[in-house]
């Protein structure tokens, strides 16, 4: 099923220099006349050249997928006492125009320029001109792929940088190479209309040989919904008269129009019956590690990767394997962790908890000659366990690290179900029966059948008004999408990012205090101050007390402090563990509005010849 990537890899080096500048034009994209594709195979090769960019480590190979979506209230990367202009500056919202990890901006425009070239080449092709504009065909599917990739790149640009240059035609020899920024509302509205135009003439994943490794009709329907909720949501806007000001959070007046679009296109996919949640929650991600890509299940589109070529999934995110030179699975230098308040927000019986929150790591034991589990540091090592190198179809080999070849998930059917429920609730002012059914479908997979009556039907039926249903969706999307670079952007469009981060720090403190003193009560009185573990014969851990605050150590077990470590003492008083003030800095959170957008890199500003500038005090 990696045939598409083998084709992509053959094209990946074309026009991809190691030092790529914003709007730098590489042959053959420097054109003096319009391109035209004379065959489907020619157009297909051109599209593969666009997909090749998506897998680059500056895009979904690592940087865009695994740097830009953090930190938030459920996931974080660790940062230092002093802000750094590295990936850590992205995570703690202190990035300056000199930050070294913003090349994704440039590569998004490389992808856009290649997509624009494909769009022009197909539009000029007799195959396209003579095709039925109302029915799916391969030439029109290829056209839709190009527009979908372009839309995806503009979604990433606008939600990370705000207003950016908007280019809808491939760069040509005589073009203006210094475009200014376009309002993000205009950009998002345009690409939504693009996708609405091409969606009916594309094939569903099940109709394609490459299944979900190519953009397809179902993925485009989901992408329309995601873009529409972003266009209809909140975002930080600049004070054009005062670039040093933080700006303001703003929601467009026409937001309900876009919620209706989100409802319409998510409903369209639901009613098509093309996708289900047949695979278990664990299987969705295990399948990715095993290179299994069903065309009719939860996954709608994932960026194709290849072993020993690209992808940091399983290495920078997933189950942690400490560095060693003996395991055929290599090791994993995991950057991302979950917060303990998130871990303990799951209901009892929710099977997603133990997949999304892993309280252990793997370490090589020289005495036994194998990998064995050890308890994780609860402050900074409880990892997202959706992906594991131990699940890979082909082990990386000794000292294996990056380039796992595990695909990056862009959009799932579960996301479409929850976006539909959200849009319906907003449009009707209360949850509709169809919105409840969509939420129930997601929760049915999350809980065993014997809990469906209580945790699915009773729970959802009890959400009777707009606000309680919305709050439930805020939680559900956290429980469903941990580690998939979705949460931060959800909180932004809901105007909840700053509020949730402030709330998180209070919850961390309360958890530390209340778990140490359960008799004092509070919502965290029953979470464990300590957990207790012993080794099984196979090297895995037998952990007791993970879900209760036990008061004594069971015979044969070792005591290990857990939630109580969220606080430490200073001058005889408990304070929040100091590391959390690095991961979530008060200097950032105390500013209202919180500046979450990244500055445009100083080199891009310099190259723009005055057409671009930074705002928000950056």
Regions from the PLM with identified roles:
Residues 35, 40-42, 47, 51, ...:
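Elongated scaffold/linker segments in the mid-to-C-terminal portions of large proteins
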Residues 3, 15-39, 191, 225, ...:
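Bacterial Sec-dependent N-terminal signal peptides
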Residues 61-80, 167, 203-219, 233-322, ...:
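Short, surface-exposed recognition loops and adjoining beta-strand edges that mediate ligand/DNA contacts
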Residues 39, 44-48, 52-58, 80-161, ...:
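Conserved, well-structured interaction surfaces
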Residues 156-160, 165, 206, 230-239, ...:
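Short coil/turn linking the two alpha-helices of tandem helical-hairpin repeats
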